[in-house]
């Protein structure tokens, strides 16, 4: 079973060209299924049936796994069985018809506009790490990049003269995004410093040894910036969520935000309308005289 799982992961990496981050998440989920099969003495993927998979989902849910995590696991299983069926190694899909237990819809965490400006407008020290990290933060917030898109960014994808960046998104789909003035300025300060490392390839963001920064290194630097400037936990996707929320709040153009984010399904983008409504409700509660009267206890 593990050999076939290895072959599937190689297929995802080489033929489907999924990002390392996505591949790691799929492998982690499928390893849970593999461990369950070994424990239940299920000796092949062909022998795993819908009842056994349903039992695993129930156990993981009882152990605290979120509905979203279980949905991703089922998606990984469906992908595996699609591959196994295509290769003639199986003739069924135990995940067919299964859905995870429903859970509360969690809204993405964002920074409000003031907090985003507080993060980005602080004084930047004149050194390698400070200029690099500032360029990373500005680009995340300016263009709404995914972590995998930023780590994979090469010099030939940047056009600072026209203020554009071309990124390779999920499913190897490319899209061209605007780069704001502040992000362009930060990149123009960073790129000459990058050359001092004699970089090994064309990566935009490199370490002091000239090697491309990986996802974990960028997560660590973003987290450090959040703790230093805001006193809170911060991760790259929070900057992407903030970009989306602030763009939608200003433009009210859901389709445009969908294109900028690279979402194939507008339903994925619609979650930001809930954030926008949440903001409007807060403004209403604080500003509308009738809302204030209700809060004051008048009837």
UniProtKB/Swiss-Prot annotation:
It comes from the Bacteria. GO terms for biological process: cell division; chromosome segregation; DNA transposition. The active site is at 146, 170, 237, 240, 263, 272 (o-(3'-phospho-dna)-tyrosine intermediate). GO terms for cellular component: cytoplasm. Residues 1-85 form the Core-binding (CB) domain. It is found in: Cytoplasm. InterPro entries: CB, DNA_brk_join_enz, Integrase-like_cat_sf, Integrase_catalytic, Integrase_recombinase_N, Integrase_SAM-like_N, Recomb_XerC, Tyrosine_recombinase_XerC/XerD. Transmembrane segments: none annotated. One of its GO terms (molecular function) is tyrosine-based site-specific recombinase activity. Residues 106-285 form the Tyr recombinase domain. CDD domains: INT_XerDC_C. Site-specific tyrosine recombinase, which acts by catalyzing the cutting and rejoining of the recombining DNA molecules. The XerC-XerD complex is essential to convert dimers of the bacterial chromosome into monomers to permit their segregation at cell division. It also contributes to the segregational stability of plasmids. Forms a cyclic heterotetrameric complex composed of two molecules of XerC and two molecules of XerD. Belongs to the 'phage' integrase family. XerC subfamily. This is Tyrosine recombinase XerC.
